């Protein structure tokens, strides 16, 4: 279907064909994504010194991440679904990846959807965050609003009835109890 031309998925564990090079993967993606931009790919790879003719299997985890992100961006899709995008990248490459995504958002119709367990990592990249829990949307807010209105609270409440009353009274997003220590995100 036509809609698949608008979506690229970048999984947590990058998958590339056995013995494939970045060029091989670009050939593959070009067949499915009519707006695949090889010139842009060559330019981006040159900026980070990744050899498009080297076997991807010889790359480090971070290099594979970079290759996957560049392949995904150059597919020219409207949406890029990313799972743990910045995992495995050193701090310099992490910032470069964030800058690349920001550039794409600013210069074309492009929306990255980034799944991460590290909310702090997303606060300077995303303007909207959704929290998923047990298959549902627990929360959907602007990052700034969320930072202003969310708090982590730790306390000890000796009486279980007081604990139940407190939990019923607050909007608790996350709750954990270890021995007598109660930790909540409200």
Question: What are these regions, as identified by a protein language model?
Answer:
Residues 1-114, 119-133:
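ABC transporter nucleotide-binding domains
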């Amino acid at each position: 279907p036509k809609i698949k031309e608008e979506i690229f998925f970048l999984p947590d564990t990058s998958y590339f064909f056995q013995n494939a090079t970045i060029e091989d993967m670009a050939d593959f993606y070009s067949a499915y994504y009519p707006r695949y931009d090889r010139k842009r790919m060559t330019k981006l790879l040159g900026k980070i010194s990744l050899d498009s003719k080297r076997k991807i299997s010889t790359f480090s985890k971070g290099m594979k991440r970079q290759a996957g992100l560049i392949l995904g961006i150059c597919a020219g899709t409207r949406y890029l679904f990313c799972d743990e995008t910045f995992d495995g990248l050193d701090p310099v490459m992490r910032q470069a990846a964030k800058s690349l995504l920001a550039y794409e958002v600013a210069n074309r119709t492009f929306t990255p959807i980034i799944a991460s367990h590290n909310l702090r990592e997303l606060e300077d990249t995303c303007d909207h965050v959704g929290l998923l829990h047990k298959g549902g949307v627990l929360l959907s807010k602007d990052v700034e609003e969320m930072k202003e209105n969310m708090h982590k609270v730790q306390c000890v409440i000796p009486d279980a009835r007081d604990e139940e009353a407190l939990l019923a009274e607050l909007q608790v997003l996350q709750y954990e109890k270890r021995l007598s220590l109660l930790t909540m995100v409200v």
